[in-house]
């Protein structure tokens, strides 16, 4: 029997790291399980990280088109426990580079009345452009060298 797995992130510029994370989350869900991906709202990204490059509606559309994903939703802008209460996952999966602490997710789940396991994916195959910031830096580098044309 499969599990309902919740994975989340910004997914601003999709890259192989995102795909590897979601493939691992899918494995945890199992063949008959469900992978629900919560995409951070623009407001949340601005508050916690930076200004998003790609608007939330486009990010959730791109994530929903990925093969491992059964359903992609926008998260609650201020309270992750509301998202947990809505989705009711069996497992919440965190990526290796996500700054959130597992214990904090457990507290949110408890507040939401959701009994779920929290797992962190420790590693996945790394590649040179496996983060949004690395991609942005590469674009800037190519632009400065005159190798990109608009």
From Swiss-Prot:
It is an enzyme of class 2 (transferase). Its cofactor is a divalent metal cation. Pfam families: CTP_transf_like (PF01467). It catalyses: FMN + ATP + H(+) = FAD + diphosphate. Pathway: Cofactor biosynthesis; FAD biosynthesis; FAD from FMN: step 1/1. Keywords: ATP-binding, FAD, Flavoprotein, FMN, Nucleotide-binding, Nucleotidyltransferase, Transferase. GO terms for biological process: FAD biosynthetic process; FMN metabolic process. HAMAP family: FAD_synth_arch (MF_02115). Belongs to the archaeal FAD synthase family. This is FAD synthase.
């Amino acid at each position: 029997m499969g599990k309902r797995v919740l994975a989340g992130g910004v997914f601003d510029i999709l890259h192989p790291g995102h795909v590897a994370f979601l493939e691992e989350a899918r494995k945890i869900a199992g063949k008959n399980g469900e992978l629900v991906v919560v995409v951070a709202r623009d407001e949340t990204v601005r508050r916690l990280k930076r200004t998003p490059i790609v608007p939330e509606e486009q990010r959730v559309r791109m994530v929903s088109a990925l093969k491992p994903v059964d359903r992609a939703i926008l998260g609650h802008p201020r309270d992750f426990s509301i998202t947990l209460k809505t989705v009711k996952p069996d497992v919440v999966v965190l990526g290796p580079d996500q700054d959130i602490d597992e214990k904090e997710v457990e507290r949110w789940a408890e507040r939401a009345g959701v009994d779920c396991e929290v797992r962190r994916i420790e590693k996945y195959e790394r590649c040179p452009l496996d983060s949004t910031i690395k991609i942005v830096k590469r674009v800037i580098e190519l632009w400065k060298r005159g190798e990109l044309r608009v």
